[in-house]
Amino acid sequence: MHKIIIIMLFFLVSITWGTTWIAMKIAVETIPPFFATGIRFLAASPLLIILSYLTKKPLLFPYGQRRFQIFISIFYFSIPFTLMLYGGSYVNSSISSIIFANMPVLVLIISHFYLKKKINFIQKVGMVIALITLFFVLLIDLKSECFFQWKGILALLLALLSHAVIYVECQKKSCNVSVITFNALPSLISGIFLSIISWFIESPNINFFSTRSILAVFYLGNFCGICGILSYFYLQKRVSSFYASIVFLIFPLIAGFLEIYIYKKTILLYELWFIIPSGLGILLTLIPINFFKNIIRFSK
């Protein structure tokens, strides 16, 4: 039964993260990014607050960390998720997902410089492979599109950096609040904040919103935003972070194939070839220090 639960959680996380990028692209077809992100969080927050009540999880962070909760609302939710939708309107889903698949690599680099975390030789090799692969993927993609989508790529890289920094800062502050507490109130704050900003700078016209864009926003909020996040954190509790993070290797493939199916796009050959070294590099950065020692000990 335990193995079945793990497989189901792994499958659910892979599907939700893989479909997130195509849903973002559909959402911004007719809805401005600020407004789409705001409604996404406003749709998710009531369910998260209800879950908080049912599970008796506090909405507020512990004393001494409540300013950090506001900081998270802005720099983990409001800004990066808006940048992700904005970037997704320029960049295809497969490239967007490849960029975010490098999250473990960036977290490791920031942890090394900010928390003085040790990096073993295998992880260093993985970092080099992953970063070089990402560089060439972005360079080739930019050249193929005549550098049209550079704003989108920059937005996605900034969103990636913001998420990685907050993740490392949570480690530094020993922020061990439940996943529901982490998401519930910041989602509500971000939803209100972004919706207000949108009315001033985007002037959204609901009459122009397509049905599929509206459905995509609610899918992002109620399914990806709740099921995906909760499933990933529960998966981390049942298996090591190394095995849980293998999801980062799977969801770019799902995003790529969905884009082919929905938008009838042909996947470029270089994208297929670069998946192998990119996945290898990310996998090597996730390997814990004692992994090979345990293998050698077991073989003896």
Curated annotation (Swiss-Prot):
It comes from Buchnera aphidicola subsp. Schizaphis graminum (strain Sg). Signal peptide: none annotated. Coiled coil: none annotated. The chain crosses the membrane at residues 4-24, 31-51, 68-88, 95-115, 120-140, 146-166, 177-197, 214-234, 242-262, 272-292. It is found in: Cell membrane. Residues 15-139, 161-287 form the EamA domain. The lineage of its organism: Bacteria, Pseudomonadati, Pseudomonadota, Gammaproteobacteria, Enterobacterales. It comes from the Bacteria. It is a multi-pass membrane protein. This is Uncharacterized transporter BUsg_270.
